[in-house]
Amino acid sequence: QKTAYDITTRLVGSELCIRDRAYFWRGESNYRLDRFPQAGNDYRLYLEFATSKDGQEYGLALYNLGYTYFKQKNYGNAGTWFTRFVGRGSANERAMQADAYNRIGDCNFYDRRFEQARQDYARAVEIDPSLGDYSLYQEAFVRGLQRDYNGKVQTLNRLISDYPESQYMDDALYEQGRAFVQMEDNANAIARFNILVKKFPESNVARRAANEIGLLYYQDDKYPEAIQAYKQVIASYPGSEEARLAQRDLKSIYIDLNKVDEYANFASTIPGGANFDVNERDSLTYVAAERVYMRGEVTEARNSFTRYLQTFPEGAFSLNANYYIGLI
């Protein structure tokens, strides 16, 4: 690349018919060396001096100039040059046209012009369906930002059915599950998350999905299913943030169920797991009994406070427990 760059630099001072191509090829050299500001300057000079605007090089200069700005996160100028490129409408550049529409969509997305971005992604998949999985994924994501959750689900269905080997498949399943959550359709959300966890267990989004399965069951008061889901997260992803969150929520479920001893037994089986000391067990056993009382389950509350006092006769909450027993 250094040699090509030196040669084209010497040619820049030549006759106009040679000079424009020299700018183009120096721009190419700079681009491949990741010198995007210099490449952009050369492409602009080529476009200024180009003797023909119909050739492939002219279109490529417009396209690459868009990328020089895009690589520098200058999305306003990037969008301008990509738009000029797609305006050529060349049938011989369909793949590049579709890619340029994706980049225009990205530029509009970053500038929060979501409806325009959605239209750009849709246009990209129309022009060249072979590159459509990215376009559909982005279009669906934008629909979610627009709170068109049903549209998001339908767009992702197209991606899943038309591009079964897509690199975006795991993300598509996760985003589809999230759309169902937003629609308060927990059953379909859980179904999508289960497919994701089964097909892509090592994916980062699979870990999140596995945890959300437990949370959705928990929110629906389906405690046995939530317990099973959270235990699966802890077993499948030990040491992860998702496992930590699952253990936290699992503790809350067992407290709600007034089964602190059962949680303590489970926690003791986790490799490198919870430090479940006497003081915490004291506190959680009392909290579980108090929650039973607050739910109005008087008989169970009396039994729970009595068990607390038997287990922790000098416990931190023994006075409170005796007080509640007196009220009952």
Model-derived regions: residue spans:
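Single conserved hydrophobic/aromatic residue that forms the stacking wall/gate
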Residues: 1-18
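Short solvent-exposed coil/turn linkers within tandem alpha-helical repeat scaffolds
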Residues: 14, 19, 46-59, 85-98, ...
